[in-house]
Amino acid sequence: MFQVEMTASVREAFGKGPMRRLRQQGITPAVVYGAGKAALPLQMDAKILMTQLLEFSRVNTVVSLSVDGQDAKNVVIAEIQSDPVTDALVHVDFCEIDLDQAREFTVPVTFEGTPKGVDLGGRLESHLTSVILKAKPLDIPNEFVINIADLAIDEQLTVADVALAENVVMVTPAARVMVAVLK
């Protein structure tokens, strides 16, 4: 899992009008919640935030978030709201996490190679683009890259065929078909 550092400051403005003015000034409203604590309203520089979000392409990432220079909180991005027309950031929700506690994460799956069954006239069907894993946040892989070059016609790859580290548990049902080569 990726790790990045970000900074923010406590937000004093609330409501629709003040939020709009913040965004016009290049500031993105945000909030941190979780761990049984009250939600903490934040504000972040929109350009810096967007640059950092693009670095890790909005995938599973542990963010070390420093608020007003205090000790950093370990958070994950729970939700990113963006304008549907301009794609500008509207709001970011962070969820505080404990790095020693297992959680569920959705991990993307990509397939590489051309199955030999496709070369022989078969048709490739991809059924899953991600799987759900449960583990400590720093033990979660960034993605699964699975080589499917050896798949012949009428063969399939299931979730059970994915090799995992011993401290990572697959939540997605083992019988689910990930990819298959059909006639």
UniProtKB/Swiss-Prot annotation:
Keywords: Ribonucleoprotein, Ribosomal protein, RNA-binding, rRNA-binding. InterPro entries: Rbsml_bL25/Gln-tRNA_synth_N (IPR020056), Ribosomal_bL25/Gln-tRNA_synth (IPR011035), Ribosomal_bL25_b-dom (IPR020057), Ribosomal_bL25_C (IPR037121), Ribosomal_bL25_long (IPR001021), Ribosomal_L25_dom (IPR029751), Ribosomal_uL5_bac-type (IPR020930). The keyword Transferase does not apply. It holds the Pfam family Ribosomal_TL5_C. Signal peptide: none annotated. GO terms for cellular component: cytosolic large ribosomal subunit. One of its GO terms (molecular function) is 5S rRNA binding. SUPFAM superfamilies: Ribosomal protein L25-like. GO terms for biological process: translation. It comes from the Bacteria. Belongs to the bacterial ribosomal protein bL25 family. CTC subfamily. This is one of the proteins that binds to the 5S RNA in the ribosome where it forms part of the central protuberance. NCBIfam families: bL25_bact_ctc. PANTHER family: RIBOSOMAL PROTEIN L25/GLN-TRNA SYNTHETASE, ANTI-CODON-BINDING DOMAIN-CONTAINING PROTEIN (PTHR33284), RIBOSOMAL PROTEIN L25_GLN-TRNA SYNTHETASE, ANTI-CODON-BINDING DOMAIN-CONTAINING PROTEIN (PTHR33284:SF1). Part of the 50S ribosomal subunit; part of the 5S rRNA/L5/L18/L25 subcomplex. Contacts the 5S rRNA. Binds to the 5S rRNA independently of L5 and L18. This is Large ribosomal subunit protein bL25.
